[in-house]
């Protein structure tokens, strides 16, 4: 079952904002359901809400409890723009597949915003443009090529040369791609809101409950838990975030460490349109504003997951992030009010793995890796819901384990 990781340390900025309480129960006896969701972070919450909306009986378990894993560490830049540029992704998986992956990501962000509005979840959602700044991976000429590739795929994008970039946003860089259709939000409030909607539809939430073994057959899946009760379901959904289970193919993932800071509230110093900002660099810097005018900045990713080493770097990494943010926006007070670190998963292409695990058709896994974890969780909720209903999402093969045995890279906390 899940390999245990301390997914975050430090003090994430979301601790400054109260999220609704999500009541859970103790698992004292065996349980049955149509679907068992293992994990009550953002991915598990989206799946539980979608499945209960479809009329399925759902049980959710988590070894910590709701909102206590990597969800609290995400910076929640909900972008459709995939970590891997469209031009690069096309070389990896083919032009048509790359374009469809980008279009589906864009649709997912739109669908998520619509679902949040439909459910009246107060998660401080704001719509924002994004700026993809020239960096070490893509310079100005490559950004122009990327802009044209997006347009050919039907995705609106505008290249900004240095002068209009500085005039419009006050940023001194060699160029940028301006895009629209992204959102920012409070991930804890969203997760709590989705779980509460699932509860209203009679979902059963148990925590702390740790799954120890999974045994699947042609007809059902039986999950044993620490403390003895078992849960029997027609389908099991693994939404364990970056605590990866032994049943998941080893080629599917790599876990890295990343860091983030948040400043004091300074709404008068926020740049125009509160655009989401990220760099065409590896590792890349990214920044967003909160609803009350704090600035969140993250990056500095490193390829290791040792908790002690990761946590020991919080102070130094925070200073580096503050300096980089200050170079981007000299008028900001970049001193951190909050600083934290987390462990997050990556893939070479920047695309997630979603769907049935090879050889285990009743066990679905949701792995929304990279800088698009929340958008990919929305895609997962759509693909998994269709699969459990007995149909197939038209884009399921793009993200299936059996379709892509990837090399692994690319990163981010967002």
Question: For the regions a protein language model found, what residue spans apply to each?
Answer:
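Glycine-rich FAD pyrophosphate-binding loop
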Residues: 53-73
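Rossmann-like flavin
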Residues: 89-197
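Extreme N-terminal leader/targeting segments of oxidoreductases
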Residues: 1-35
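Active-site substrate-recognition segment that forms the wall
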Residues: 110, 118-126, 230-361
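N-terminal Rossmann-like FAD-binding beta1-loop-alpha1 element of flavoenzymes
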Residues: 33-60
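Helical element adjacent to the flavin cofactor pocket in flavoenzyme catalytic cores
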Residues: 148-149, 176-234
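C-terminal catalytic lobe of FAD-dependent flavoproteins
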Residues: 310-311, 326-414
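Redox-cofactor binding/interface segments in oxidoreductases and associated redox assembly factors
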Residues: 38, 80, 238-239
């Amino acid at each position: 079952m899940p390999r245990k990781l301390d997914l975050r340390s430090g003090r994430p900025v979301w601790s400054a904002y109260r999220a609704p309480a999500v009541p859970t129960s103790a698992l004292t006896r065996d349980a049955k359901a149509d679907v068992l969701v293992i994990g009550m972070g953002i991915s598990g919450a989206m799946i539980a809400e979608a499945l209960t909306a479809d009329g399925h009986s759902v049980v959710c378990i988590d070894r910590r409890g709701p909102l206590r894993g990597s969800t609290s560490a995400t910076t929640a830049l909900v972008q459709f723009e995939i970590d891997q540029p469209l031009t690069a992704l096309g070389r990896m998986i083919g032009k048509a597949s790359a374009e469809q992956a980008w279009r589906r990501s864009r649709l997912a962000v739109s669908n998520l915003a619509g679902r949040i509005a439909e459910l009246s979840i107060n998660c401080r959602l704001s719509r924002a443009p994004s700026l993809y700044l020239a960096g070490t991976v893509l310079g100005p000429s490559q950004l122009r090529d990327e802009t044209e590739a997006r347009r050919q795929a039907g995705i609106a994008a505008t290249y900004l040369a240095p002068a209009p970039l500085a005039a419009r946003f006050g940023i001194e860089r060699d160029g940028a791609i301006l895009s629209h259709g992204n959102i920012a939000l409070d991930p804890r409030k969203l997760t709590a809101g989705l779980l509460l909607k699932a509860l209203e539809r009679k979902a059963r939430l148990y925590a702390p409950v740790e799954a120890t073994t999974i045994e699947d057959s042609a007809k059902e899946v039986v999950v044993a838990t620490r403390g003895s009760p078992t849960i029997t379901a027609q389908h099991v959904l693994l939404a364990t975030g970056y605590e990866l289970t032994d049943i998941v193919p080893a080629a599917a993932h790599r876990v890295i460490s990343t860091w983030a800071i948040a400043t004091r509230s300074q709404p008068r110093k926020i740049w125009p349109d509160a655009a989401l900002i990220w760099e065409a660099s590896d590792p890349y810097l990214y920044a967003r504003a909160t609803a009350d005018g704090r600035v969140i900045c993250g990056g500095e990713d490193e390829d290791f997951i040792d908790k002690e080493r990761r946590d020991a770097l919080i102070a130094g990494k925070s200073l580096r992030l503050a300096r980089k943010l200050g170079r981007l926006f000299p008028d900001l007070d970049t001193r951190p009010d909050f600083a934290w670190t987390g462990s997050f998963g990556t893939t070479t292409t920047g695309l997630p793995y979603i769907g049935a695990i090879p050889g285990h058709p009743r066990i679905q896994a949701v792995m929304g890796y990279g800088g698009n974890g929340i958008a990919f969780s929305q895609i997962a909720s759509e693909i998994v819901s269709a699969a459990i209903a007995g149909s197939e999402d038209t884009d399921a093969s793009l993200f299936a384990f059996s379709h892509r045995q990837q090399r692994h890279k690319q990163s981010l906390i967002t």
